[in-house]
């Protein structure tokens, strides 16, 4: 099985790429991201993950573009998680205050990917 994934703008670009190569992938992981490409009629397994304290992800756009994903897209909200903790670059300007440690959010994310990619 092949999955594509990305964080923030990288997630949007991953979704765009997958939309043009949909037959080559089994699924897509979006981390604090949304897809402007229409994948709604695809058979992809799509997982959307973001933190409850994310201050960077534009939730209005996230909701607006939700219809571009398959109906059975699974959404996982990391309680206390933030935008910056999907990467290793420090806290991003405008992000919320996380209620979990960086290592904890990374571990939850890895566990989620591992469990759902079986």
Report the location of each language-model feature.
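Acidic catalytic loop of the alpha/beta-hydrolase fold
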Residues: 53-57, 83-84
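Short alpha-helix in the alpha/beta-hydrolase fold that links the catalytic acid
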Residues: 57-68
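A conserved short beta-strand
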Residues: 23-35, 45
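Gly/Ser-rich "nucleophile elbow"/oxyanion-hole loop immediately N-terminal to the catalytic nucleophile
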Residues: 1-3
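Short, proline-enriched alpha-helix->beta-strand connector loops that line the catalytic pocket
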Residues: 40-46, 69-73
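Short beta-strand/loop motif that positions the catalytic acidic residue
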Residues: 48-50
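Gly/Ala-rich beta-loop-alpha elbow adjacent to hydrolase catalytic centers
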Residues: 5-14
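C-terminal catalytic histidine-bearing segment of alpha/beta-hydrolase fold enzymes
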Residues: 73-118
């Amino acid at each position: 099985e092949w999955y594509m994934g990305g964080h923030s703008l990288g997630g949007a670009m991953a979704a765009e790429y997958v939309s043009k190569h949909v037959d080559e992938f089994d699924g897509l992981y979006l981390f604090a991201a949304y897809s402007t490409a229409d994948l709604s009629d695809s058979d992809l397994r799509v997982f959307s993950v973001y933190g409850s304290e994310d201050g960077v992800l534009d939730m209005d756009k996230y909701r607006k573009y939700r219809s571009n994903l398959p109906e059975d897209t699974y959404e996982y909200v990391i309680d206390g998680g933030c935008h910056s903790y999907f990467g290793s670059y420090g806290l991003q300007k405008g992000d919320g205050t996380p209620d979990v440690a960086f290592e904890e959010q990374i571990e939850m994310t890895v566990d989620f990917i591992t469990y759902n990619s079986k």
